[in-house]
């Protein structure tokens, strides 16, 4: 426990909050261009081929972004919108692509949770 005199000489320092998504620079989303679209494998104990893309953002950052949903139409030079949100079993992937905006198509035949995948309501 510090004495009052010690606190007068050197006050307590505030903890600085570190951003989980530094490339967004405080913005909700950012636009970017895909430089590479590929699949990668998750950490143990999971097993899959996760779809990810490397994105060069408008602010100059280059980040890895996860492509959610079943199937996608992205390729190199596609313009995408990314949002924050990491993928726990993919190290280094801290962003998600937003489906249904810019060059990213929504997920086909999606019935539930459609807003997260840019899917239209469709005929019932």
UniProtKB/Swiss-Prot annotation:
Name under which the protein is recorded: Small ribosomal subunit protein uS12
Subunit architecture: Part of the 30S ribosomal subunit. Contacts proteins S8 and S17. May interact with IF1 in the 30S initiation complex.
GO molecular function: rRNA binding; structural constituent of ribosome; tRNA binding
One annotated Gene Ontology cellular component of this protein: small ribosomal subunit
NCBIfam families: rpsL_bact (TIGR00981)
The family this protein is said to belong to: Belongs to the universal ribosomal protein uS12 family.
Keywords per UniProt: Methylation, Ribonucleoprotein, Ribosomal protein, RNA-binding, rRNA-binding, tRNA-binding
Biased composition (Basic residues): 113-124
Purpose of the protein: With S4 and S5 plays an important role in translational accuracy.
Residue numbers carrying 3-methylthioaspartic acid: 89
Location of region: Disordered: 1-22, 104-124
Taxonomic lineage of the native organism: Bacteria, Pseudomonadati, Pseudomonadota, Gammaproteobacteria, Oceanospirillales
């Amino acid at each position: 426990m510090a004495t009052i005199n010690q606190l007068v000489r050197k006050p307590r320092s505030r903890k600085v909050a570190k951003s989980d998504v530094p490339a967004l620079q405080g913005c909700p989303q950012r636009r970017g261009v895909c430089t590479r679209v590929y699949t990668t494998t998750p950490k143990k104990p999971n097993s899959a081929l996760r779809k990810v893309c490397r994105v060069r953002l408008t602010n100059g950052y280059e980040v890895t972004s996860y492509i959610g949903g079943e199937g996608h139409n992205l390729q190199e030079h596609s313009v995408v919108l990314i949002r924050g949100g990491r993928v726990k079993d993919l190290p280094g992937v801290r962003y998600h692509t937003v489906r249904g905006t810019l060059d990213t198509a929504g997920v086909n035949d999606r019935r539930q949770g459609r807003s997260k995948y840019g899917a239209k309501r469709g005929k019932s």
